[in-house]
UniProtKB/Swiss-Prot annotation:
Active site: H200
Uppermost EC category: lyase
Protein name: Carbonic anhydrase 9
Cytoplasmic topological segments: 436-459
Summary of subunit composition and partner proteins: Forms oligomers linked by disulfide bonds.
Residues the record lists as binding Zn(2+): H226, H228, H251
Source organism per UniProt: Homo sapiens (Human)
Signal peptide (UniProt feature, chain positions): 1-37
Pfam families: Carb_anhydrase (PF00194)
Transmembrane stretches, start-end: 415-435
Assigned protein family: Belongs to the alpha-carbonic anhydrase family.
Record: glycosylation sites: T115, N346
Cysteine disulfide links: C156-C336
Gene that encodes the chain: CA9
Amino acid sequence: MAPLCPSPWLPLLIPAPAPGLTVQLLLSLLLLVPVHPQRLPRMQEDSPLGGGSSGEDDPLGEEDLPSEEDSPREEDPPGEEDLPGEEDLPGEEDLPEVKPKSEEEGSLKLEDLPTVEAPGDPQEPQNNAHRDKEGDDQSHWRYGGDPPWPRVSPACAGRFQSPVDIRPQLAAFCPALRPLELLGFQLPPLPELRLRNNGHSVQLTLPPGLEMALGPGREYRALQLHLHWGAAGRPGSEHTVEGHRFPAEIHVVHLSTAFARVDEALGRPGGLAVLAAFLEEGPEENSAYEQLLSRLEEIAEEGSETQVPGLDISALLPSDFSRYFQYEGSLTTPPCAQGVIWTVFNQTVMLSAKQLHTLSDTLWGPGDSRLQLNFRATQPLNGRVIEASFPAGVDSSPRAAEPVQLNSCLAAGDILALVFGLLFAVTSVAFLVQMRRQHRRGTKGGVSYRPAEVAETGA
């Protein structure tokens, strides 16, 4: 964590200690000054149920208790049923055992990510001609339908869920958040990529080699991307900004390089990371998105898929990778595993009105219904702090940028160490100045002055 710059006026405001107390004060400060503390650990999971299929979430610590100032939960859209009480949640003995997968799989496949953000198909009608050929062994769920998500996955009732409402004025400006680094996102036309209607979203499977860094030692590789949208006249982004919902939202899901498989990373702090960007209406067609939207007719039915040429994945995201909000949350669909690092870009992506209509009015979901309004209601922060890489509001048209308070992302221990460090520096300078003065006085005191003797000579 980058320390705050010390004030240049602070030494002038602290008087130098008296000569007799200098050594005592210096020794006292040496005993008090601690080693610079490490940054407080990120929030642990609230219960062993929060790990989804992994079932290995860390328990909620006392430091994770929510504050009194939680963001209000908005009225649920057709993406979430009311959460059951604690008595409705199954115990640990109800969780299914995780069956290890074959070690013969050499590389990550989409099957390794059965329910990350856009999971596999729910129960499909028997007359669906485009049933998934690879099968679907996951629990069935849908937006706005039974069963309630916490019964599908108990982690969906966790305390640190996503999406959330972002309030720029309450975001903590954190200079340590550096511009994101993307490598290998410009894909050649071949090999082609799989574009699929999984009944919950349109999902593009990404090949190996797409790397992303959130900072030193925080490297990830991209697995897939998908979209969330609304309906005609009804916006459908998952995250909101001060209650404002955008027409659509793109998610690019990444796996930490510290894990070989997705099921190992589920529920682990920082195991998964998602890049999110808001989509809104603009005057011109977006050529990058048109490469995908023009193929939606081919996958209109649930479970159908097609092959599309490789494209520049970074062109689907905003051009400014330096301005974003970041917080720790969860997957926004079952299993709702927590520990996911969310990076929500400040800049939006423009699509034409026709393209947004194509996105929301082409695909079909479960039960021969339109695949629309596939977003989850915003969840309470429960004491979490959203960090910002910039000290400004959201640059989204037609919404004007708004100033935010420069809240510090430093922990209390960091600030305490900084204060003691400044006091130590000031005392050291005062001690050196005092020693120098005493040295000068001692040197002058050793000189004896004798009056000049005038020898009288005879005339």
